[in-house]
Amino acid sequence: MGKEYDVIVIGSGPAGYVSAIRSAQLGLTTACVEKWVDEKRNSILGGTCLNVGCIPSKALLDSSQKFLEAQESLHMHGIKMSELAIDLPMMMSRKDNVVKQLTQGIKGLFAANKVDSIVGIGRISAKNEVSVLGENGKNEKYQAKNIIVATGSVPIDIPPV
């Protein structure tokens, strides 16, 4: 049997990590369960939006917008460039750094607010109980007075009419 908490949050996306941090700030013992892991088997916090969705796409859009501005409007300011090129590996590196900085920020907030991060797939297994399937294939059960489900969603295919 794992540790007992006042609050366990399943999912560390925008709703999950904010819920976990706020719960801890209110003095509740808090854990957050996340299934995404890095190559060192540490939790990757932030969910789809931060890691592969909204934030990375906006970082790349920002770089693309800068390129377009340089291409189309800098000459109006008396700035002339002989050669303008996109360095895609550099753009991707910048995007990765933006994501890393934000995920590290969440990790720092978890540490500062004493939120435990649990790696695995969480599910409610009984009243006030969360079962976490770890990468080792073992289930560990945690007790919680309150459980917040913040797992996000996945789209479904709508069958043709």
Task: Cite the ranges covered by each PLM segment.
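Beta1/beta-strand and adjacent pyrophosphate-binding region of the FAD-binding site
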Residues: 1-15
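Glycine-rich flavin
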Residues: 2-5, 22-28, 32-161
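Short glycine/serine/threonine-rich phosphate/pyrophosphate-binding segments
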Residues: 15-22
